[in-house]
């Protein structure tokens, strides 16, 4: 395996690998989500308190997808997941222990499994990998994200 592996179309199996490999923390970044996030967190061997989600809520989505997203977020919070909000987030990533990730265009939804998407599997420790800056940026976004979407700047 190389440090960056392209994944055309559906990244689900790679997301699952990353979720199952988590040893200390698993974080998902996604502006759009559904029960897929719950499923991936359930497949992770860690407790709910070691799981995190970063999403955006800076525009009101009154569609069924937006309603589903709110239901899933409320369930995650009840389960003990650390849910944070980052205005204008558009990145899609699942990150295990800040050293393995899948980053790409695919939202964490069941619908996106049938879309034309491209993602990349990243491994910080593969020979020749120079991905420290990438994982540092994701970690900075995690730290930057707030816990209350009501406080977000809506500019």
Residue ranges and their predicted role:
Residues 3-8, 102-155:
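Signature of lipid phosphatidyltransferase scaffolds
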Residues 12-78:
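Primarily the HKD phosphodiesterase
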Residues 37-38, 95, 112-113:
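Short glycine-/acidic-enriched loop or helix-start segments at secondary-structure transitions
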Residues 81-86:
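General small-molecule cofactor/ligand-binding pocket signal
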Residues 88-90:
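Short Gly/Ser/Thr- and Asp/Glu-enriched loop/turn motifs at secondary-structure junctions
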Residues 92-95, 120-121:
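Short beta-strand scaffold segments in enzyme catalytic cores
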């Amino acid at each position: 395996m190389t440090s960056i592996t392209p994944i055309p179309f559906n990244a689900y199996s790679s997301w699952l690998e990353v979720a199952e490999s988590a040893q200390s923390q698993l974080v998902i970044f996604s502006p759009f989500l559904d029960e897929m996030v719950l499923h991936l967190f359930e497949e992770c061997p860690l407790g709910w308190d070691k799981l995190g989600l970063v999403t955006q809520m800076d525009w009101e989505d009154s569609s069924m997808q937006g309603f589903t997203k709110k239901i899933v977020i409320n369930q995650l919070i009840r389960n003990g997941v650390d849910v944070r909000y980052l205005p204008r987030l558009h990145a899609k990533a699942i990150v295990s222990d800040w050293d393995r990730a899948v980053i790409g265009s695919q939202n964490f939804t069941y619908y996106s499994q049938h879309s034309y998407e491209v993602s990349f599997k990243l491994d910080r420790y593969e020979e020749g990998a120079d991905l420290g800056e990438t994982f540092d940026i994701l970690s900075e976004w995690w730290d930057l994200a707030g816990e209350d979407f009501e406080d977000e700047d809506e500019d």
